[in-house]
């Protein structure tokens, strides 16, 4: 079937990119549980430049509320400790040799509600991005049909596919949000 250069898979890729971004943003929201991903944004001043923590140490979760950071180079322990303290994550490392232990404090009810609001904001921004992708796709289809590059039937069929992809992506966003909300509110 002629699609006049219209690629539904490209639209789906753009929509998936938005949900991947949401997953990353939601992963950065600190819940009461320890997760190695909490330290992904930490940059360490090392060897004359800023390096991601995961290039200098191994992060593990030995207990649900404890992170363990095993620094590979003994000379970098202080720099890693400073980077974690300066990261605004609210974590205070306890250093034992080349291992830093980070206790994850309990979240109070007010902070949990704030985090849920932030998660909702991220999800809404993702929904808006997905709708923009849908609008771009539908505009392209209208142009192609207007220029007689595709038939009206093809335009309607492809528009229906675009809507199906949008609905599926929005559903995925809602599921990601619900899971994160449950994780945040679980004491």
UniProtKB/Swiss-Prot annotation:
This is Ribosome-recycling factor. HAMAP family: RRF. It is found in: Cytoplasm. Its main location: cytoplasm. Belongs to the RRF family. One of its GO terms (molecular function) is ribosomal large subunit binding. Keywords: Cytoplasm, Protein biosynthesis. The lineage of its organism: Bacteria, Pseudomonadati, Pseudomonadota, Alphaproteobacteria, Hyphomicrobiales.
